Structure formats: C-alpha cells, structure tokens
A protein has these predicted regions:
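Acidic (Asp/Glu-rich) sequence patches and key acidic residues
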Residues: 1-140
Length: 142
C-alpha cells in the first residue's frame, strides 16, 4: 500500500469573512460530535475542523507482514464510522448552515510513499456525503 498516513476532517468556514465560531457551527450541525473533537484553530478566521481520523501505518508495525492489512482495515473502519455519524446529521441542518453562510466539506490528507495511492470510500460514506451534498477533497504530498 502506498498510503503511509491518513487524516480526515469535516471542515467549515463562514464565506462572509466573519469569525468562524466552532460552537456556532457545532450547534448548527445539531448532533452530538460523538467520538470527534474540534481541532484548535490557529486564528479566529481559520476553518473549523472536526477531527474524524488520524491514522499512521507505523502504528501497526507490530503486525509484521500484516501491517498493511491492519492499517487498511483501520482506515476503512474510520471512514465507515464517519459515514455512520454523518447519517445522524439531518439534511435540513446542513441546508441551514449553508443559508447562514457556512461552507462545509471534508478533507482527506494522505501521505504517500510512491506515485500511487490506494484509497477508496466505503459505500456508507459515499452515500452520506452525497445525501448531505458534501464535497470530499483528497490531498496528498505527491
């Protein structure tokens, strides 16, 4: 597998240039953040990032030759749980956030060690991104 590290967030910012209030954004989502937490904002106008997952392949080195299978399974579980959590967000809440000027999307940052990356979305995540009309940006170091 070429992916060494994956970080995924649900990101949001106000398009009108106002201060991005994390508490206001979370109230707008209208659901418990569950296992997720808000990453520190470097400045008040920086995007609000709800940390969904941050997984390193090196965490699974103790599995020897099975390291990549365990890493891939952990990434898949993380993405599936994210989809299941998104299923709890009512579409009208996301619509209201947009009407209030919030731009909401998801970002997957991948660190890869070669010129290919093996990355796929579980159906539950694809379905929920579509239902909520959320874009997914996949960024990498290559």
């Amino acid at each position: 597998m070429a992916v060494q590290h994956m970080r995924i967030v649900l990101s949001a910012y106000l398009t009108n240039g106002q201060v991005n209030d994390a508490a206001e954004y979370l109230r707008g989502l209208g659901v418990s953040t569950g296992p997720y937490s808000v990453a520190p904002q470097p400045s008040p106008k920086a995007a609000v990032n709800l940390e969904i997952g941050n997984i390193e392949a090196a965490e699974f080195a103790e599995h020897g030759n099975e390291q990549w299978n365990h890493f891939e399974a952990a990434v898949g579980q993380c993405l599936s749980r994210f989809g299941e959590w998104l299923a709890t967000v009512p579409t009208q809440n996301m619509d209201r956030l947009r009407e209030a000027g919030w731009k909401v999307w998801s970002i997957a940052n991948l660190w890869i060690d070669q010129d290919q990356m093996d990355f796929h979305l579980p159906p539950v995540l694809s379905a929920q991104l579509g239902r909520l009309e959320l874009e997914l940006y996949v960024l990498s170091n290559e």
